[in-house]
Regions:
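Beta-strand elements of well-folded, non-transmembrane domains
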Residues: 9-11, 57-59, 70, 110-114
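A conserved amphipathic terminal alpha-helix motif
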Residues: 111-158, 162
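Hydrophobic ligand-binding cavity/cleft-lining segments
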Residues: 1-46, 162
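Short, surface-exposed coil-to-beta transition loops
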Residues: 2-4, 61-65, 87-91
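Hydrophobic pocket/interface hotspot
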Residues: 15-20, 26, 51-53, 68, ...
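Short strand-connecting beta-turns/loops that link adjacent beta-strands
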Residues: 12, 73, 97-101
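Glycine-rich portal/gate segments that line the openings of hydrophobic small-molecule binding cavities
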Residues: 37-83, 138-142, 147-148
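Beta-strand/loop substructures that line and gate deep hydrophobic ligand-binding cavities in soluble
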Residues: 80-131
Length: 162
């Protein structure tokens, strides 16, 4: 299965890249009622880092471990090591449109688990991808466009803007 979503944010490439490099950005752009509980992750994501987190879908905890790969100014990839899919590779790409606008492109390749329970959970998650990424685009724009004059984001600032 493949999914692609693109949106533009009125913020420079460096600001968009820096925002996504903070592990706290995941929780900041996760739509309610889903809760992203991060168990272990560095403050700033770098090549080879792992994120261990739980996505709470109501009362259902979905534990996930992802490795961060191909990190650079223009994006990074998170690859599921353990989680609800048999295979999940998510490429986050950032492309400058001009000095003040950046395209954010999410490309996901996934395979459902063979186990019936996890296949149903994964399929439910997959079918909600358009809603998830519409929210993420809106929230990213909301956070970055009001703060794009600020050259750097901190985890504290991200936590202050749930």
């Amino acid at each position: 299965m493949q999914y692609r979503h693109t949106f533009h944010v009125h913020a420079p490439l460096a600001v968009v890249s820096d925002f996504h490099a903070h592990s706290a950005s995941m929780g900041a752009i996760t739509p309610p009622p889903v809760i992203a509980q991060i168990h272990q992750a560095p403050v700033r994501l770098q090549e080879g880092d792992e994120m261990d987190f739980t996505l709470w879908l109501g009362p259902l905890p979905i534990r996930w471990v992802a490795r961060i790969e191909h990190v650079g100014l223009n994006g990074f990839t998170d690859r599921q090591l353990r989680g609800p899919f048999r295979r999940w590779v998510h490429r986050h790409s950032f492309r400058p449109i001009n000095e003040t606008t950046t395209a954010v492109i999410d490309e996901i390749e996934a395979e459902l688990h063979r186990h019936l329970f996890w296949a149903v959970v994964g399929l439910g998650m997959w079918l909600n991808m358009p809603l998830l990424f519409a929210y993420r685009g809106w929230k990213t724009r909301s956070l970055l466009e009001k703060s794009s004059a600020q050259p750097e984001f901190s985890s504290a600032k991200l936590k202050d803007n749930p």
